[in-house]
Design a protein with these regions (language model features):
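Conserved active-site tyrosine of GNAT-family acetyltransferases
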Residues: 20-25, 113
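Vicinal oxygen chelate
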Residues: 6-15, 61-87, 90-138
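Conserved short beta-strand elements that form part of the metal-binding/catalytic scaffold
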Residues: 31-66, 109, 115-122
Length: 138
């Protein structure tokens, strides 16, 4: 492993598969590569993979407990980030936009109230050098 590991896929449990597939294909422009009655594999042109698995309408998700809190996605341009923000607003899923001199982040919530954050200038262009203060607010 001379170059270290890289993220391969993200698995997210959701309440309603159709609703979540619609959200992620619309907001992040992912495409459905495979699908069953209870799961879907969504992929991006860059190779990012999101696996959604339906857990039913009563499945809880609590922010702040042990486990992955959310995934931060990165786009290639400010125009792409603006498009993500617009789609989040159209879906009434937009929460806020924050920026620094290096990175701008748009935050929304998916249909299961899971945080979705999208940044322009991802880690390949603007790697983190310090811990983000936001992690202490959960």
């Amino acid at each position: 492993m001379a170059h270290g590991a890289r993220l391969g896929s993200v698995v997210t449990f959701v309440q309603d598969l159709d609703r979540s597939v619609s959200f992620y294909t619309d907001v992040l422009r992912l495409e459905v590569a495979d699908r069953s009655a209870t799961a879907a594999l969504l992929v991006s042109p860059t190779g990012a993979q999101l696996i959604l698995r339906a857990m039913g309408s009563n499945a809880p998700h609590t922010l702040g407990n042990v486990g992955v809190q959310y995934v931060i996605w990165a786009v290639d341009s400010q125009d792409d980030l603006d498009l993500c923000e617009r789609v989040l607003r159209e879906r009434s899923a937009y929460r806020q936009t924050r920026g620094s001199e290096d990175v701008t982040a748009v935050e929304g919530r998916d249909p299961d109230d899971i945080v979705v954050m999208i940044t322009y200038r991802g880690p390949d262009q603007a790697p983190l050098r310090t811990l983000p203060v936001r992690i202490y607010g959960w």
